[in-house]
Amino acid sequence: MIRRAVVTGSFYPGTPERLRTQAADLIIGDLPKVRAIGAVVPHAGYIYSGRIAGAVYARLIFPDVFVMLGPNHTGVGAGVAIITEGKWETPLGQVPIDTELAKAILRNSQTIEEDDLGHQREHSIEVQLPLLQACGRPFSFVPICLFSSEFAACQDVGLAVARAIAESQRSVLMVASSDMSHYVSREQAKVKDRLAIEAILACDPERLHRVVRWEGITMCGFHPTTALLIAAKELGATSAELVSYATSADV
């Protein structure tokens, strides 16, 4: 199966030349690299969040495989949907799904379902791929889309991903795709976002999940991020750093 791009021309340029130029401009090449277990990046249109995502990717030592955890904005498909075979297409070419790792994740989970419907119209993972393609290194990936936001579902996903990565003994990096506060003032966004960011920097998935709900933080990918933190802790993560932060008002 080949999944065709659905937000090309809106979230990012629709022609290979323009997309390659913009994506390369967003990836700052001279930053010191780190070998990370996971990263959290935004997924708005490149004009709004591309520089934040690009700054994060520029800091990372490139792995062989990315596990992409994104929210399901459409509500269509399984509560937690994975695709284990095929390729995803962008104007810069096709990116293969890592079938071996995807099937290992599915095998280790009680919650994740094989389902392409949840991914068909969803942009949160798609927008990451051109930025990674612009880095010029071959890679494969595993797409996991979460609509279920209960902590138990996040825990199941996180532990399944961690077990599969540990079993693979390969170079794998997890990415949680999430924007921060929506539909509030810049001042309100910064206050609320800080609460979520502090939980992420503390590598505390329970705290993140709790504070987002209690404080009414409209962080659309808090559940993929919670799952990532659970997996990262299981894989030995003990610290995190903030690479960059901005709101759409800063553009």
Predicted regions and their residues:
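Active-site histidine-anchored catalytic micro-motif
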Residues: 1-230, 234-237, 245-250
